[in-house]
A protein has these predicted regions:
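A sensor for short, sequence-defined functional sites
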Residues: 1-300
Length: 300
């Protein structure tokens, strides 16, 4: 209410909006009760555009709401008490990762990763850095990458620009002796390790917090003194006939280099119970493919 009052004081048209957060449950639109609502945000008209604001999240950018607010129906507190929709289907998290792996002059395998997470993942990373520091984030990245990989030179672009997504950059080096066989997972810690949809059946709708589009690209040199012994197969899996989701897994060789691409796109956030098995099997396949490895064998 204070934010709404401040905007009105500056002659900006604004009104409070009441809603029910995702954990609080849905609002019954036919017979709404005040007890069904548990959260308040502000709706302002800026240059003819409707802008939602929430003063409770200091790291939340302009015109953004916390993910917990996207729970379908909300109600504007004005003369008409009109109903508006805050649907998770309108929230898109887009993540891009590019990885480059090359052979160093001494024969070591080194690389760099450049990543732009989605907006809300960027916000979570900012909170982690604020609470625990950049060094702890580096330690967490090392843990995700694996004990046989050393991570250095972490850079965070746009850390203090809360309206922007983060830019995450770091270098890495594969440690260890040159074994006769090298097992290399091209996802380098970015893959899905387990399926979030574990239950065999579900009686309630699936309500994800956003739609998603995650693209991961890797370009690597074949390690010096090695040849490719085994390589995963490329494939494309569609979520359904309406093409509301797709999983691409593409890998190819050209000369002494390997190109790899993984893309997961889910075009809507809400699914009915009879669609649960489809969604679960889709991510089962993602987990399976993301675990596959390239096998390099030392030249004889």
């Amino acid at each position: 209410l204070l934010l709404t009052a401040m905007l009105k004081h500056e002659d900006i048209t604004a009104a409070p909006v009441i809603l029910s957060t995702r954990s609080h449950g849905k609002v019954y639109s036919i017979y709404p009760l005040l007890s069904q609502y548990n959260y308040l945000v502000t709706l302002a008209m800026v240059d003819g555009n409707a802008v939602f604001m929430d003063a409770s999240e200091p790291l939340l950018g302009y015109g953004r709401l916390p993910l917990r607010c996207y729970n379908e129906e909300a109600r504007v507190i004005n003369e008409t008490a009109n109903v508006i929709s805050l649907s998770a289907n309108t929230v898109a998290e887009v993540k891009h990762t590019n990885v480059y792996v090359v052979n160093e002059e001494k024969g070591n395998i080194i690389g760099s990763k450049i990543q732009t997470p989605g907006y809300y993942e960027s916000m979570n990373l900012r909170e982690r850095v604020k609470e625990k520091g950049k060094e702890q984030l580096l330690a967490d990245i090392k843990k995700e990458m694996g004990t046989d990989i050393d991570v250095t030179n972490l850079e965070l672009d746009s850390l203090n620009l809360t309206d922007e997504v983060l830019g995450v950059k770091y270098d890495f080096e594969l440690k260890g002796e040159k074994e006769d066989i090298i097992y290399f997972n091209p996802m380098l810690g970015e893959g899905y390790k387990e399926n979030l949809f574990k239950s065999a059946e579900r009686a309630y709708p699936v309500e994800m917090p956003f739609t998603m589009d995650e693209v991961y690209n890797l370009q690597m040199d074949i390690p010096q003194g090695y040849v490719v012994d085994e390589i995963p197969k490329s494939m494309i899996l569609k979520l359904n006939e309406e093409n509301e989701g797709v999983f691409e897994y593409r890998i190819s060789m050209s000369g002494n280099s390997i190109s790899f691409r993984s893309r997961i796109r889910i075009g809507r956030a809400n699914f009915q119970p009879d669609e649960y098995e489809m969604l679960r099997e889709f991510f089962n396949y993602v987990v399976k493919k993301h675990a596959e490895q390239i096998v390099f064998k030392k030249k004889s």
